[in-house]
Amino acid sequence: CAQCGEVAPQHRSVDQLKTKRWGPNCPTCGEALTPIPTDESKPLQCGSIYALSKKNQEEKCLLFGRTYAFPVVALRYFNIYGTRQELSNPYTGVAANFASRIMNGNAPMIFEDGRQMRDFVSVRDVVRANMLAMESSNADGMALNIGSGQPISIQEVAAELARAMDSDLTAELSQKYRAGDVRHCFGDITAANKLLGYKPQVRFADGLKELVQWLCSQQPQDRAAEMVAQLSEFGLTA
């Protein structure tokens, strides 16, 4: 917040999302907030069952390590993309979802206004991070962010993917929301760099080129509309 400094806003309420006020505001002065990278010291806020399950898994693994003196490192992956990703499951990742839509001649569907930011990291960099964590004891008993460290808006992701696939399709901004989604999420990877020597090597544009080359041999089904219908049925989007 420009007035109050660094703050930790609560999850956006359904009432706020229904009025299409996408950005979180300062809990003290009400001003619009500018997102910053999330480091590992930030309290874990679980706005969805999925998020809570990830938190519980991490805590169980770290507790197992402490209890039985077993080396455990919890890696917090951000938005992974790359070859061999499931393309016909609309819940597996936005890059795969967009690719499936484009390959079936449909425009990518984006929730909210498309300006929400995420941290996309190549599966190749994630594999390197896993190897580093297994080969070093520097981070035993810790949780570390694994991402690219470079935020990008969802609308930009759709546009770059369409260009890489030589498509003139433009993303559809649904102006709908998904309950539990955070507005922005991108990681501070300083700790992983310091403790493991982790440095992302795959630029997003290069990773997309590799993904598109692999896509040429795939025949995905576009099930995005089915996903939206399921979310609507359970009251998780509007």
Give the residues covered by each predicted segment.
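Intrinsically disordered, low-complexity acidic/proline-/asparagine-rich linker or regulatory tail/stalk regions
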Residues: C1-C29, P220-A238
